Amino acid sequence: MKILKPAVAGTLESSDCMVTVEPGCGELELDLDSTVIRQYGKQIRRVISETLTRLEVTDARVTVVDKGALDCTIKARVECAVYRSNDIRDALPWGGAIQ
């Protein structure tokens, strides 16, 4: 899925994350800022990467500011930001129903 325009999902509240997606420059670029990066940084990056791969996003700039969100929350925020960037609003395939 191509990122058509900048989009944001989530908040900066505790146990949440804010995900921003923007059109890329030919590659996937991930910028992660997390309050728990030392403990869970690799896992957070893995969840983001797997979600983007499942959505077939290969060219985007993704910025995630994490405040201790669970994996399921991170996944949902990434999905939401990608769908918003494409103005997809109806019949959303949430929770891994894609493919």
Where are these regions (language model features)?
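N-terminal intrinsically disordered, cationic/polar leader segments
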Residues: 1-99
